[in-house]
């Protein structure tokens, strides 16, 4: 209960920034209570995933936008569901692409069985992978589209929002529970979001270890359909043809099985 109150307090802080940037018309469509519930649920899952890393040094960082908006079907967040395409359905395209950067086998079909979801996430952790969102708001797609429209000065409210919430991403990456490889590889999942994050962090992000995470436009891995693919991720991460992939079956170790 104490942790939940902390998350709700954090959300109120971020929501105030959103409120300051949105116009009155946009404010009317934003459902604060649902956004708060999604935020709390995602933060719990994020903390759990930090335990999963278990001193592994992050080599592959993927920066995303935010957890998807949901209202009636439960929170659909990467670190809770892995994939939200439905039980026994092939995972959505970008998750297949991500999986195949590291694994020669196909990713498991989605399942409601939590053990399958956790095993998939454990396998990615074994490959020193971390996904971090840059915004704390699971807004509806049309709400984000409205924010992304350019204003008269050539900027957008979306860029203002990413800049105003730049501490959200910075706090995530500076978490002392995360250990980093000597030269982490960075990719952005989405074009507009990546561009806004790069502008908001022109000097990069200095980690507690003294390492500097530097961002550039070559790291944007979004393809023509708006999502990253295996090829674009390999390009963003400068990882060649991923020749060191394995079939990823039975990749959990004993430490992860106990989580």
Where do the language-model regions lie?
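Detector for methionine-enriched segments
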Residues: 1, 223-225, 252
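Short, flexible loop segments at boundaries between secondary-structure elements
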Residues: 92-107, 204-247
